[in-house]
Amino acid sequence: MKIAILYREEREKEGEFLKEKISKEHEVIEFGEANAPGRVTADLIVVVGGDGTVLKAAKKAADGTPMVGFKAGRLGFLTSYTLDEIDRFLEDLRNWNFREETRWFIQIESELGNHLALNDVTLERDLSGKMVEIEVEVEHHSSMWFFADGVVISTPTGSTAYSLSIGGPIIFPECEVLEISPIAPQFFLTRSVVIPSNFKVVVESQRDINMLVDGVLTGKTKRIEVKKSRRYVRILRPPEYDYVTVIRDKLGYGRRIE
């Protein structure tokens, strides 16, 4: 099997550790930083870092490429193994004993160009700026208006990222939906809405505001169009992986109080 290993900038040592182990059984055809430019073509991409590293690596992968993350960051929603579990991973790899998750991207079109996001796209004011009036038009429906600091449009993958911190719901990865969440809206009852993923969303503000794609500032714009992309990646999990256990352990959600 031809494997690429991509690592977070300061995690080269951990990447070398995995390379040494994996290369005993498989051909490592690429080894480098996840934020380096270019596409990666391999049978499997191994990522060393946290969720941010996985997001960068996913955009370099060909459609449908399986990916597996080794946790070397903080929360690690998108990582599946720890470095101490390398032997367990190699055993699972020999037998292809994984649970697979399909994680799809959204496509964002604006005057800044076309972008892909696995987590979310955000339009928000500068810290020194005033609140903005934002129009959100969902395909086949009339417009919604928010007077807020901004708005986040996220995938199910991104529901445990920025959207969660501003009151959005946790969405299981298998759901085919998009989540629209206003940031600090003027009216308390203005909450997140969840829509079918096949609906296009147009967001327009009164003035140029910041656009962030997966947390990375790309520039200022007034208008974006968001729709589900055909691009996707496959995240490999250990066979016993359970999403509820993950959100309970990492977020404390649904934890029993004794």
UniProtKB/Swiss-Prot annotation:
Its cofactor is a divalent metal cation. It is found in: Cytoplasm. It catalyses: NAD(+) + ATP = ADP + NADP(+) + H(+). NAD(+) binds at D51, G52, N119, D120, K130, D149, T160, A161, Y162, S163, L164, S165, A184. GO terms for cellular component: cytoplasm. It comes from the Bacteria. Its main location: cytoplasm. One of its GO terms (biological process) is NAD metabolic process. Keywords: ATP-binding, Cytoplasm, Kinase, NAD, NADP, Nucleotide-binding, Transferase. Its EC number is 2.7.1.23. GO terms for molecular function: ATP binding; metal ion binding; NAD binding; NAD+ kinase activity. The active site is at D51 (proton acceptor). It is an enzyme of class 2 (transferase). Belongs to the NAD kinase family. Homodimer. Involved in the regulation of the intracellular balance between NAD(H) and NADP(H), and is a key enzyme in the biosynthesis of NADP. Catalyzes specifically the phosphorylation on 2'-hydroxyl of the adenosine moiety of NAD to yield NADP. This is NAD kinase. It comes from Thermotoga maritima (strain ATCC 43589 / DSM 3109 / JCM 10099 / NBRC 100826 / MSB8).
